[in-house]
Amino acid sequence: MAPTALLSVSDKRGVVPLAEALHRLHGYQLLSSGGTAKVLQEAGLPVTRVADHTGAPEILGGRVKTLHPRIHGGILARRGDPAHEADLLEQQIDPIDVVVVNLYPFRETVATPDVSWDAAIENIDIGGPTMVRSAAKNHAHVAVLTSPEQYDRFLKALSGSAGGVNANVRRQLALEAFAHTAAYDVAISRWMQSRPELQPDVEAAAPAEALPWLEALPLRQTLRYGENPHQKAAWFSSPMGWGGAKQLQGKALSTNNLLDLEAALATVREFGYGSSGLHPAQQAAAVVVKHTNPCGVAVGDGVGIALTRALDGDRISAFGGIVALNAVVDGPAAKELTSLFLECVVAPGYSSEALEILAAKGNLRLLELPPEAIDAAPKDHVRSILGGVLVQDLDDQPIDPSAWTVASQRQPTTAETADLRFAWQLVRHVRSNAILVARDGQSLGVGAGQMNRVGSARIALEAAGEQAVGAVLASDGFFPFDDTVRLAASHGIKAVIHPGGSLRDADSIKACDELGLAMVLTGRRHFLH
């Protein structure tokens, strides 16, 4: 009896060449359903439809096609087992040797921000995962393919082995199949948890540990290397968030590139992003990042002006940096981007003039990330620790100046209040202990990652230099002593903002009053580790 391959795919890339090779080179009979059968027949291949094979028509609008003993018996039967072979003979079931199935595009469907509950539910595959799991369970006798990326590898293994692919290949394919269905189920659960339609009573809610919070993610690409060249790395991503980005030019991405891009994007989104989506840009903004810390941030009348001001904040540190822009890159911005060596740029889009200019920098990585991809991404912040992960809410709540209090005798001026808000928006994106000096919508100096707060302040103030005179200073945590306030005043800082809450707050407030500084307390800390 000729071997049989069952093909039923949503992603039809490569399915015709695969079926041609199976049938014409290796003598497989082809069994298929629905749209896949139509594609194969149009390619001139002899196909038996599943409905003809089982004697049962597709019903319920296609919800039931392959859930039939003649399908699953053929997949699950152990070859050489007398009892199984007797059952096959009695029920007139033919063995199925290769199962090629990929699933309804659920993740792609729910990546659309306005997707309805019913539309998403209709894209939950039932028959597909059942066939995949059946074939993976019986991998001792059946090969299962769940992605077009596997086809060439499978055909190569098939050509190099008489009597079908060897057990090691089938075992590896089974592993990949179970990973595929696991990721699919977690994606469904994850999406349902996020929906307003699902509001269970407290008594009916499952324990938190029973709900999968982390979506199993498919491999997006193997990276050049990890944080260092001797470390291997890979990027796993859903179609949402960074998975929705398109790289327009440049070298392959590294781990550090993605970490810096993430930091830059989070910072520039403080000012909105793009012209569509949930939070469109209200003002053009630019961010330059090095080692996940912003070294230059600015707003301006146009993305080119914002970029120039951001780079001017610290052009020495900007060399080799990562840039995020919240508006379409135009010609002037592109010219500024070519003025120094940069690793990556991310923006919601690029004009044709900008792309022509930037093409001269062939190694510069240009990424286009639409606002809709950002809006659809999960809101959890996840980090790994040895043997586990930590999950927390993103620190992206809107800034609320109405919750602030002025602790000093002197009230900040209108201009100082605007600068304090700008600095407070940014300091939460700087590694603790974090200090940021700013004025007129431009960062002037950043102190990051020091083990004591006054050390970070010293770095930020020295970076700002003479521009610190009349500027403001923000701190992500409270001042444990009055030394930071006194240092700030000695450099000409006129107002400071911090969470407050130190046992020695009174000392810092007293120093502000002595030195004529305004002090604002926000009541909210913004540590970043």
From Swiss-Prot:
Disulfide bonds: none annotated. NCBIfam families: PRK00881.1, purH. The keyword Cytoplasm does not apply. Residues 1-146 form the MGS-like domain. It comes from Synechococcus sp. (strain CC9311). The keyword Amino-acid biosynthesis does not apply. GO terms for molecular function: IMP cyclohydrolase activity; phosphoribosylaminoimidazolecarboxamide formyltransferase activity. This is Bifunctional purine biosynthesis protein PurH. Pathway: Purine metabolism; IMP biosynthesis via de novo pathway; 5-formamido-1-(5-phospho-D-ribosyl)imidazole-4-carboxamide from 5-amino-1-(5-phospho-D-ribosyl)imidazole-4-carboxamide (10-formyl THF route): step 1/1; Purine metabolism; IMP biosynthesis via de novo pathway; IMP from 5-formamido-1-(5-phospho-D-ribosyl)imidazole-4-carboxamide: step 1/1. Belongs to the PurH family.
